[in-house]
Amino acid sequence: MGKEFLIKELFVKPKGILSLQKHHHRAEHWLVTQGNAKITLNKDIIIKKPGEHIFIPLEAIHRVQNPGKKPVKIMEAQVGSILKETDIVRYQDIYGRVK
């Protein structure tokens, strides 16, 4: 199967945090469009501001947090052979979705 593409917009509420996760079949490219995003990429913590971007490689452990008082918005471009929500391995999750 060839490479597929999917674009979606992520919203992270103030003081919110998404699950710590990785993907077996896709890489992601994030462009911050609003707020300051605190991004975990493997063992690194990176702050990205509006207009800044980051590449999340295949198999990289990652998450985004919003340490601020305003929502964070990120445009996410997914590239890979499988672009489904089933391609998520979660390590930490405040909603109890770690298997």
Named regions from a protein language model:
Residues M1-A27:
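A short glycine-rich, His/Asp/Glu-containing loop-to-beta-strand
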Residues F5, H25-K43:
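Glycine- and acidic-residue-biased ligand/ion/polar-headgroup-sensing regions
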Residues I7-F11, H29, I45, H53-F55:
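Conserved hydrophobic/aromatic beta-strand scaffold that supports enzyme active sites
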Residues K13, H25, V32, K49, ...:
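A short, compositionally biased micro-patch
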Residues G16, H25-R26, D44, A60-I61, ...:
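A generic "binding-loop/recognition-motif" signal
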Residues L41-I61:
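Short acidic-glycine-tyrosine-enriched beta hairpin
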Residues R63-K99:
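Double-stranded beta-helix
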